[in-house]
Amino acid sequence: MTSHSDRPESIPATSDAQPSAARRRLLYAGVAGAAALGGAGLAWWKFQPHAMEQGVEEALWAMEFEKPEGGVVALKSLAGKPLLLNFWATWCPPCVEELPMLNAFYRQQAQNGWQVLGLAIDQPSAVRKFLQRIPLEFPVGLAGLGGTDLGRSLGNLTGGLPFTVVLGGNGRVLHRKMGQITPQDLQLWAPLR
């Protein structure tokens, strides 16, 4: 005698059945969401300053850079006071946009001991031409492509610009920022020593 439950029409559907359209949409949405989160996380990580190379702070203060107008700027001459070190280039729109703000910060904070040094990752002739059009009150050093290596040693692994490093009067890195600075950044940094 066969039981009623042995009939094929009474056997429940197995997992071999096709998922419904609603389930497929949920599955696709979940996969797309996970991919978006992963991509956003990777982008965030890539543009964060990373660990600095060992001994870079000490080596930094021994460096000298030619100035566009002639002569050299020695970082050791800037030691003992807070320093905003900005890596920039004439061909970098966010760099050019933030320079007037950096110039105003320098003007306003110099009496509080602040110093600003711009390190141009650029050809000397391009920097000279640029500074004739847009003069800056703070000193500029011609870092060339070697400035990219210095930025990397300070934690800018992508070599992106602009890149800003804030150093305290004791010579230690207090803050690093990859990307264009904001007025809020400068307000946050101004009380640092």
Model-derived features with residue positions:
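Structural microenvironment flanking redox-active thiols in thiol-disulfide oxidoreductases
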Residues: 96-135, 145-152
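Conserved hydrophobic/aromatic "anchor" residues
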Residues: 63, 87-88, 130, 138
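Aromatic-flanked redox-active Cys/Sec active sites in thiol-based oxidoreductases
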Residues: 86-92, 121
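N-proximal helix/coil linker or "cap" segments that precede and/or mark the start of modular domains
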Residues: 30-62, 129
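Alpha/beta-hydrolase fold active-site loops
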Residues: 82-83, 162
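N-terminal secretory signal peptides
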Residues: 1-22, 32-37
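A short beta-strand-turn-helix
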Residues: 62-82
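Thiol/disulfide oxidoreductase modules built on the thioredoxin-like
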Residues: 133-136, 144-191
